[in-house]
């Protein structure tokens, strides 16, 4: 759990006294304890000289109404306070950096988001004046999205002249050359295939590529929202939500 991670990284911490559901780890053999200590040290080294509460990530892969995430909020809040963060800064940091949730039901995701916002607002009455960006999502299915049409509309290789994707009769002017050799095409192809039945498989879906590849593609596509033509912008708006959930599923978390 995230609480156990914190205590192993900070053995002298007293925050566990505030955690109602904290369970003291069972005593381990010397060999196992060495392995655990090595893992904890590796995780601490990722942040520098000590574990940074802003880097701790918690995912509820079937978040429902958000009960577990709300409990995690209290746990994380104690960590931030112990490190001397200002109370008014903590709610936004937790919601935007620490907590992640997925569900197959959009109503459940809405309830979880609402529960977290209300929990955070107890600590910062001004929070909703500039609402934080939550990492809670209801998984979307790809539906009838057509890979070839999306790729042609995106025109990432500028194989067609801008504004001439189609002729007056709607037939495609020309096909992009060898899209199968483009890593971006392969990523989009994977995303569309993985999420074809997302409402059935939910967070059991395992992404094939590292998180960074989906993030890089998302950033590249988002640039087209400012510079692209009408077809490019429409294609980006269809793909970005799918890439966001791909990023959440590909991401490595401290606690799940």
Question: Where do the protein language model's features map onto the residues?
Answer:
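SAM-dependent methyltransferase catalytic region
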Residues: 1-255
């Amino acid at each position: 759990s995230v609480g156990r991670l914190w205590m192993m990284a900070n053995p002298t911490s007293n925050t566990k006294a505030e955690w109602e559901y904290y369970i003291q780890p069972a005593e381990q053999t010397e060999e196992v304890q060495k392995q655990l200590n090595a893992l904890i040290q590796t995780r601490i080294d990722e942040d520098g000289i000590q574990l940074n509460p802003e880097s701790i990530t918690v995912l509820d892969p079937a978040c429902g109404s958000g009960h577990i995430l709300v409990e995690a909020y209290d746990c994380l809040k104690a960590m931030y306070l112990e490190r001397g963060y200002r109370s008014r800064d903590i709610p936004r940091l937790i919601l935007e950096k620490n907590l992640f949730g997925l569900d197959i039901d959009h109503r459940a995701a809405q309830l979880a988001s609402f529960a977290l916002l209300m929990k955070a607002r107890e600590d910062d009455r001004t929070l909703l004046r500039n609402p934080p960006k939550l990492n809670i999502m209801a998984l979307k299915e790809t539906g009838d999205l057509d890979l070839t049409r999306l790729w042609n509309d995106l025109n990432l290789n500028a194989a067609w002249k801008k504004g001439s994707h189609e002729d007056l009769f709607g037939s495609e002017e020309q096909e992009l050359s060898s899209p199968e050799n483009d890593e971006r095409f392969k990523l989009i192809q994977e995303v569309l295939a993985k999420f074809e039945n997302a409402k059935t498989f939910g967070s059991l879906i395992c992404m094939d590529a590292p998180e960074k590849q989906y993030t890089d593609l998302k950033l590249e596509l988002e640039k087209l929202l400012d510079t692209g033509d009408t077809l490019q912008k429409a294609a980006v708006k269809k793909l970005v939500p799918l890439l966001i959930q791909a990023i959440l599923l590909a991401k490595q978390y401290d606690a799940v």
